[in-house]
Amino acid sequence: RTFPKKVSHFGKIKKVNREKVLRKPKDLVTAYPGHVLALDTVEKQRNGRRMYILTAIDIFSRTTFAIATRSHSSKTFAHFFYLVMQMFPYEIKTVLTDNGSEFKKCLDQLLKQNNITHYHTYPKTPKMNAHCESFNGTIQEEFVDYYVNLLFDDTTKFNEKLSQYLEFYNTKRVHYAF
């Protein structure tokens, strides 16, 4: 892989550094619903075919949203985030994602258009996005593993069942240990 080069005024060739991304502050505390929304992807494979479940969770209120797709491109995630903005009853101020390519280009453009701050976690630190990772584990254990055949056979029916599960998850399911 070649990196772009830059020539200094002395004639020496220098490597051009990549554009830096805004990292999540270590002391970030959510103060109200919509302050920080965490996004992530769950990937399932079967017979060489991949399906993706795009997930979003508001860290303060623990309100969630998810949808299954065949692609996890930046354009797909931008459309997903647009749906999230329509579904969530409050204004989103900050988005927290990992460093995946699906969170670049189109999603970044949508976030900039809506004046939403986009924080990235540090590389190889899933603990910085622990709420979303925990939700991903929960949704896989409680829902996806039971309907994995439906996920690959009929995505529309899977998404209908998923919306019913998310309604249960957001309104009736107990989230905290006693």
Residue ranges and their predicted role:
Residues 146-161:
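Short, charged, surface-exposed loops that flank catalytic or proteolytic processing sites
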Residues 160-178:
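Charged, gly/pro-enriched flexible loop segments at helix/strand junctions
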Residues 49, 66-90:
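Active-site beta-loop-alpha junctions of metal-dependent nucleic acid enzymes
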Residues 33-65, 71:
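An active-site-proximal beta-strand-loop segment
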Residues 97-112, 118-142, 156-157:
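RNase H-like two-metal-ion nuclease catalytic core shared by retroviral integrases
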Residues 67, 93-98:
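Short catalytic-loop micro-motif centered on adjacent basic/acidic residues
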Residues 94, 117-121, 152, 164, ...:
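Basic nucleic-acid-binding interfaces
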Residues 1-35, 109, 125:
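Basic, flexible linker segments flanking DNA-binding modules
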